[in-house]
């Protein structure tokens, strides 16, 4: 069995988180913003699972990953509902136009 060092997992997780952060900061489409947040959460999940490789008898990484996935699913559902409601009202997906609190 080939053993992959923990550093590889952490580098991949850091790259995923960086891509998600850049996508969140540079893009203006609300759907792309949601996908960037999900990408960052998946990077966190990869880090938590990599923690389990270092501590194989401690299942905290897998348990936290399960909770993060459950919360991410709820966040995606609520976020998509908000984006759809915003699109119905404004007919646009740009986050710059999200000034509904300003009349």
UniProtKB/Swiss-Prot annotation:
Species this chain originates from: Sorangium cellulosum (strain So ce56)
InterPro entries: NADH_UbQ_OxRdtase_chain4L/K (IPR001133), NUOK/Mnh_C1-like (IPR039428)
The protein's name: NADH-quinone oxidoreductase subunit K
Gene3D superfamilies xref list: 1.10.287.3510
A GO CC term assigned to this protein in UniProt: plasma membrane
Enzyme Commission numbers on file: 7.1.1.-
Record gene name: nuoK
Role description: NDH-1 shuttles electrons from NADH, via FMN and iron-sulfur (Fe-S) centers, to quinones in the respiratory chain. The immediate electron acceptor for the enzyme in this species is believed to be ubiquinone. Couples the redox reaction to proton translocation (for every two electrons transferred, four hydrogen ions are translocated across the cytoplasmic membrane), and thus conserves the redox energy in a proton gradient.
Summary of subunit composition and partner proteins: NDH-1 is composed of 14 different subunits. Subunits NuoA, H, J, K, L, M, N constitute the membrane sector of the complex.
GO molecular function, one term: NADH:ubiquinone reductase (non-electrogenic) activity
Membrane topology listed for this record: Multi-pass membrane protein
Family: Belongs to the complex I subunit 4L family.
